[in-house]
Amino acid sequence: MTIRSILQYAVPALALACASLPAAASTVRIYVTNSAGDSIDVIDPVSNKVVQKIKDIIGAHGIAFSPDASRVYVSNEETSTLDVFDRKTGKLIKKVPLSDHPNNISVTRNGDRIVVAIARGKGGLDIVDAATLTLKKTIPANGGRLHNVYVTPDNKYVVGGSIPSKTFYVFDLDKEAFAWAMPMDLGVRCMAIETNADGSTKRVFSQMSSLNGFAVIDFAEQKETARVTLPGVPQEFDHGGYRTNEPSHGIGVTPDNKTLWVTSIPNNAAYAYSLPDLKLIGKVDLPSEKIAGHDKLLSAVANWVTFTPDGKELFVSNSGMRSVSVVDTAAMKVVKVIPVGEVPKRNNTLVIPDTAGNAAAPAPAKRASAQ
């Protein structure tokens, strides 16, 4: 399902970067969920080719991994389950029933729990026990239906956002309880986390409904300190009209904590901002397509981002073009476009340890993103 098919047949695309990047290991893989297909593509970032497919999963959304790289966790919107796969074989281990319809997921640093955003019903945060693969509890969010959730790099909190309640939420991971919330004026979508020198959370950068840019949240002060709008373009790209309420969807902080990358659907680009000063340092144009009878070029519809552990490459899922763009972050250009499945949504980086004895303990999570 490309944007061409969306425009020609008016087929609505499913909606829609953040798992931690391990510090060192022998093999890196980029996982991409195909939200309108029935598979997950696994990319080798050395060859930039798909080297594995996890098949027979419809409704794949968020994706994360166990620290030892043995399991792949996927939130399944079709069955309202957390699907657990064997990483090597791609075979399903178990479908864990959740409290309601899920969205994004994240994993604790030691891998003992998987946290799942619940986007329907009463909402809240589901906690899945990784040892028993059962739903441990649901933490209420004062009626908030959560969209994206992320375990903070210091493993102390889970941060999340709600689109309908327009609220930024924080949960205490040790107590497994609601901590605090901050009302916003727009729906809260994708997030990225900037850390202090000690690994604690400094700022959260959050993309918002109807904002072609992002909000800046001071975590300690519990307040919004800035709002950044992405640069304008002479003419916006066509995106089929189905993502007008989420123009900026896909955001991430590089593993070295020095650069923030932000995508734009109408601008069809990814922008780089230096940290901590948030100065614009570059723009990368994403793939586009020309269709007869349409005045504008078609946007790739950037959806989510993830990095290689060294931060040299950025992978952008193009949900409108069944592909993933590989961006050289130093050269500021797309170096490869990799075909994947239908409406690629979330992507994530996995580093497989050298041996079974080497834990793939994630380095501080720098990125989070999109719907």
Label every PLM stretch briefly.
Residues 4-5, 14, 18-371:
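Predominantly soluble domains enriched in secretory-pathway, periplasmic, or organellar proteins
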Residues 1:
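Short Lys/Arg-enriched helix C-cap and helix-to-coil transition segments
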Residues 9:
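Cationic, low-complexity basic patches in intrinsically disordered or flexible, solvent-exposed regions
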